[in-house]
From Swiss-Prot:
It is found in: Cytoplasm. This is Elongation factor G. InterPro entries: EF-G-like_DII, EFG_II, EFG_III, EFG_III/V, EFG_IV, EFG_V, EFG_V-like, G_TR_CS. Catalyzes the GTP-dependent ribosomal translocation step during translation elongation. During this step, the ribosome changes from the pre-translocational (PRE) to the post-translocational (POST) state as the newly formed A-site-bound peptidyl-tRNA and P-site-bound deacylated tRNA move to the P and E sites, respectively. Catalyzes the coordinated movement of the two tRNA molecules, the mRNA and conformational changes in the ribosome. It comes from Methylobacterium radiotolerans (strain ATCC 27329 / DSM 1819 / JCM 2831 / NBRC 15690 / NCIMB 10815 / 0-1). Its main location: cytoplasm. HAMAP family: EF_G_EF_2_B (MF_00054_B).
C-alpha cells in the first residue's frame, strides 16, 4: 500500500499540561471531531478513549501515552497523549522526544501550574514548537488574560493571542478570531458541531483591535517585506498572517494562544485548524542527528522515504491481546512487515512481525510504514525504550534519551511459590515498559525491591501487579533510597594470604581511593606498570570493588561518586588467582570507606505547595518541621505558592497531612532535585535502623 499522505501533510504532536487541566478531554474531542470515536468518553465517567488502563479509568488520570492517528482537513494527525502527573514526567520526556510540535493546555482558572512548568521546560530541552490552548473557559474564575500573563511570568514564554474569549464562566459563548477579525459563536451544547461566524460584539471591538495590532506587529517582525508594507500602512492579508504565524511557531519566536472549553465542545475545531496551520510537519523539523554504527562519526537522517530506514522506540506496553507492543517513530526511509532490521543500540537483529496503527484502544494492521509515521510493532524481542531500529546495511544510532534515577523504594514479598513465579515475569515486563522503574533483589533479606519516582508511581505499579498479573504479595513501607559517599582521600595497601596445605591464596593490592565529582558515579583505573598485577587478574579486582559499591560500610546503601586507582600490587606464581584479587580488593575498598569518613546522602525534593492564604502559616511551619528549607513564596490568583527543598524521608504521607489542615484546599507537587548529606543526628538514626 503506497503512502496516502505526503510527509508535509503529517502533524506529529502531543498534548501536554498539568494534571486536571483537561488534556484527555481535549484529546477526546479532537478524536470525536476528526471522526474516530462516535461516542465521546468523559474522564469523570471513567470512559475516555485514550485512558484505557483500568488504573487510569478509576483514578481519572492518564498514565501511559497512547498514540492515535486521525485526520483533519486531509492532514494526518498523530496524537500522543501524555500524562500530567509529576510522577510520570518520564513518559512526557519520552513523547516529547518523538514529537514535532505540542499543544500546551492550560486550565483557564489555574493558569500555569507546577507540572505545566516542568513539561514546558522539558519541551524547551527538546526544542518543541508549541501552541497554547486555554481550556475550561466556562469554569468559575476562568481568566484568559491572567493565563497569558502567567506564560510570561512563570515559564518565560512569549504568548501572542490569536483569539480572545467572548464572555467567561457560564456566559462563555465563543471566541474572536483575530486573524479573520470575526466572532465564532457556538450554539447550544450539542457536541459543538454548529458554530456561526458573526461580527465582533460592539463591547469587545476595541479590545479586539488592540490585540489584533499586537498580533500583526509580532508577525511582521519576521518578514522584511511584510514589515515595510505594514510601515506603509498595509496590513498583511489572512493568508500572509497564517504563513507568518507558522514561521513564528517553527522558529519559536512566539507562542500563539487560543481558548475554549473542550468539555462544553467550544473552540476545538479552531484548535485543530491551528495544529494544521501552525505546527510543523516532519519535513519542517528537518534532519535528525545520529552516530554512524560502524565509524562512530556523527551522521544525519532526512525525513524522506528514500533515505536509509531508521526509527526510534519510545514506548513499550504489554497488551493483553497482542503481547508486547513497541511504539516507534519512523524518522527516515520505510519499513515493511517481515523485514529484518538491526537494533543498533544493542547490536541485536529484530524481525518486524505485525505492524499496527493505533487508535486509543483498537488497532489496524498495516503492511508498511513511512518516514513520519508513528506505529506499534508487536513481538520485538530485545528492544527497549530509547533504542534505535534501522537498516542493517546503513546502521545508525539516533540520540539516546536520558532517564532519571529513582528515589523511592518498597519491598515486595510474594505470598506463595506460584506468586513468586508470576511476580518475576510481571516485574520484568513492567521494567521493560518504564525505564524510571527499577527492580532489584536485596542480597541479605532476599526481598524484591521496587524503585520509582514517587509514591503514586509505585502505587500504580503495585496495582498493576495485583490486577493485571494477579500477583498476591505483601507490600512493605516505602523506603528512601539513601546513598553513601567517601569524604577523604585514602591510600590503602592490603595483602590477602591464606595457606591451608596445597594451593593457597595470595594477592596484594594498593589503591588510591578519593571522592569523585557529585553525579560522576564510580570510576576505576589501573595504573599498574611492569606487571605488578597481571592483566588477567584486573577483572577480579573490578569484581571485588563492584561488590562493595552495592552495599557500603555505614548501613549497606549503595556507594556513589568515588574514584579508585590501582597503583601497585604483588602476586604469587602459584597461589594467586582472580578470586584472590577479588577478595583482596573487596577488603581494601571496605577499609578505605571506613577510614575515609563515609557519610550518608539523602534525596532532597523540590516541593511546591499551592494553598489558600489563610493556611500559609501552617504550611510553612509544617515544612520547617520536616527539615524543609523555604526557597520563596509568591501569589498565584488568590492562592499562595510556597517553594521549598525538603528531604524525601520527611515527605511520606504528606498529602494526607496537607489535606487535613487545609480542608483539602491545598495541593502540592514534588520532584527529585539533588542528593545532600544527612545531618549527623538524623544519620545516626538511619544507620541504627538499617545497619
Amino acid at each position: 500500500m503506497p503512502r496516502t499522505h505526503a510527509i508535509e501533510d503529517y502533524r506529529n504532536f502531543g498534548i501536554m499540561a498539568h494534571i486536571d487541566a483537561g488534556k484527555t478531554t481535549t484529546t477526546e474531542r479532537i478524536l470525536y471531531y476528526t471522526g474516530k470515536s462516535h461516542k465521546i468518553g468523559e474522564v469523570h465517567e471513567g470512559a475516555a478513549t485514550m485512558d484505557w488502563m483500568a488504573q487510569e479509568q478509576e483514578r481519572g488520570i492518564t498514565i501511559t501515552s497512547a498514540a492515535t492517528t486521525c485526520f483533519w482537513r486531509d492532514k494526518r494527525l498523530n496524537i500522543i497523549d501524555t500524562p500530567g502527573h509529576v510522577d510520570f514526567t518520564i513518559e512526557v520526556e519520552r513523547s516529547l522526544r518523538v514529537l514535532d510540535g505540542a499543544v500546551c493546555v492550560l486550565d483557564g482558572n489555574q493558569g500555569v501550574e507546577p507540572q505545566t512548568e516542568t513539561v514546558w521546560r522539558q519541551a524547551d530541552k527538546y526544542d518543541v514548537p508549541r501552541v497554547v490552548f486555554v481550556n475550561k473557559m466556562d469554569k468559575i474564575g476562568a481568566d484568559f488574560f491572567k493565563c497569558v500573563a502567567d506564560i510570561i511570568d512563570r515559564v518565560a514564554g512569549k504568548p501572542v493571542c490569536l483569539q480572545l474569549p467572548i464572555g467567561a464562566e457560564s456566559s462563555f459563548q465563543g471566541v474572536i478570531d483575530l486573524i479573520k477579525m470575526k466572532a465564532i459563536v457556538w450554539s447550544g451544547e450539542a457536541l459543538g458541531a454548529n458554530f456561526d461566524e458573526t461580527e465582533i460584539p460592539a463591547d469587545l471591538k476595541d479590545q479586539a483591535v488592540e490585540y489584533r495590532t499586537k498580533l500583526v506587529e509580532a508577525c511582521v517582525e519576521l518578514d522584511d517585506d511584510a514589515m515595510s508594507a505594514y510601515l506603509d500602512g498595509n496590513e498583511p492579508d489572512e493568508a500572509t498572517m497564517r504563513t507568518l504565524v507558522r514561521k513564528a511557531v517553527q522558529l519559536r519566536a512566539f507562542h500563539p494562544v487560543l481558548c475554549g472549553s473542550a468539555f462544553k465542545n467550544k473552540g476545538v475545531q479552531p484548535l485543530l485548524d491551528a495544529v494544521v496551520d501552525y505546527l510543523p510537519s516532519p519535513a519542517d523539523r528537518g534532519e535528525i542527528k545520529g552516530i554512524d554504527f560502524k565509524t562512530e562519526e556523527e551522521t544525519v537522517r532526512h525525513p524522506s522515504d528514500s533515505d536509509p530506514f531508521s526509527m526510534l522506540a519510545f514506548k513499550i506496553m504489554d497488551d493483553p491481546h497482542v503481547g508486547t507492543i513497541t511504539f516507534c517513530r519512523v524518522y527516515s526511509g520505510k519499513v515493511e512487515t517481515g523485514a529484518n532490521v538491526l537494533n543498533s543500540s544493542r547490536d541485536k537483529k529484530e524481525r518486524v512481525g505485525r505492524m499496527l496503527l493505533m487508535h486509543a484502544n483498537n488497532r489496524e494492521d498495516i503492511k508498511e510504514a513511512f518516514a513520519g509515521d508513528i506505529v506499534a510493532l508487536a513481538g520485538l524481542k530485545d528492544t527497549r525504550t530509547g533504542d534505535t531500529l534501522c537498516d542493517p546495511q546503513k546502521a545508525v544510532i539516533l540520540e539516546k534519551m536520558e532517564f532519571p534515577e529513582p528515589v523511592i523504594e518498597i519491598a515486595v514479598e510474594p505470598k506463595s511459590k506460584a506468586d513468586q513465579e508470576k511476580l518475576g515475569i510481571a516485574l520484568s515486563k513492567l521494567a521493560a515498559e518504564d525505564p524510571s522503574f527499577r527492580v532489584s533483589t536485596d542480597q541479605e533479606s532476599g526481598q524484591t525491591i521496587l524503585k520509582g519516582m514517587g509514591e503514586l508511581h509505585l502505587d500504580i505499579k503495585v496495582d498493576i501487579l495485583r490486577r493485571t498479573y494477579k500477583v498476591d504479595a505483601n507490600i512493605g513501607q516505602p523506603q528512601v533510597a539513601y546513598r553513601e559517599k567517601l569524604t577523604r582521600r585514602q591510600e590503602i595497601d592490603y595483602t590477602h594470604k591464606k595457606q591451608t596445605g596445597g594451593t593457597g591464596q595470595f594477592a596484594r593490592v594498593k589503591f588510591v581511593v578519593e571522592p569523585n565529582e557529585p553525579g560522576a558515579g564510580f570510576s576505576f583505573e589501573s595504573k599498574i606498570v611492569g606487571g605488578a598485577v597481571p592483566k588477567e587478574y584486573i577483572p577480579g579486582v573490578e569484581k571485588g570493588l563492584n561488590s562493595v559499591l552495592g552495599a557500603g560500610v555505614l548501613a549497606g546503601f549503595p556507594v556513589v561518586d568515588v574514584k579508585v586507582e590501582l597503583v601497585d600490587g604483588a602476586y604469587h606464581d602459584v597461589d594467586s588467582s582472580a578470586l584472590a584479587f577479588e577478595i583482596a580488593s573487596r577488603a581494601a575498598f571496605r577499609e578505605a570507606l571506613q577510614k575515609g569518613g563515609s557519610v550518608l546522602l539523602e534525596p532532597v525534593m523540590k516541593v511546591e505547595v499551592v494553598s489558600p492564604e489563610e493556611y500559609t502559616g501552617s504550611v510553612i511551619g509544617d515544612l520547617n518541621a520536616r527539615r524543609g528549607q523555604i526557597q520563596g513564596q509568591d501569589m498565584r490568583g488568590n492562592a499562595n505558592v510556597i517553594n521549598a527543598m525538603v528531604p524525601l524521608a520527611n515527605m511520606f504521607g504528606y498529602v494526607n497531612q496537607l489535606r487535613s489542615f487545609s480542608q483539602g484546599r491545598a495541593n502540592f507537587t514534588m520532584q527529585f532535585d539533588h542528593y545532600e548529606e544527612v545531618p549527623r543526628g538524623e544519620a545516626d538514626k538511619v544507620i541504627a535502623k538499617y545497619a
